[in-house]
Amino acid sequence: GIVEELAKQYGIEYGYTEVYPTMENAQLAAGCDAVSVTPCDMSAPMLQRFHDLGVKAICCRSIGYDHIDLEKARELGMKISNADYPPEGVANFAIMLMLMSLRNAGHILKRGEVQDYSLKGKLGRDISHCTVGVIGTGRIGQTVLKHLSGFGCRLLAYDLYQSEEVKKIAEYVPLDTLFAE
């Protein structure tokens, strides 16, 4: 695969495991300069354990990195990186999944594979008649809300830190209200 090609091209040794890092299996990183993770426990004790094993960097394969104790990483001199995605791409993908779900696209595609073009179970809903809630109004959440605003649906938002820009197109509500509606 691509990882093997890049490792060979750049003279990098790597190991791989499907298990999430824990205090019990952290020794798998012994001798490694960096550990690449998806969002999982990267609390102070976990970072200390990796540091004690010689790990110098944590590379997070997600946009968010709030699961990493950045203060502890700084204290240990560990480098932290995360993946960067264009908010538009992620937002559009999320909206596509919403639309496909509302229109029963999965069912329609499966029925089409067997030449069933009847309407049974294929009628969906129109998003313009829906209330859509977005949890988290950072760059991606704001982009989702901006793009959805053109569909005419009612928009609700929840975030601990409210954005004045979001207030122009969505209503901030408590999390319980967002789930209920």
PLM-predicted stretches and their roles:
Residues 1-32:
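N-terminal glycine-/charge-rich "phosphate-binding" loop or analogous flexible N-terminal tail
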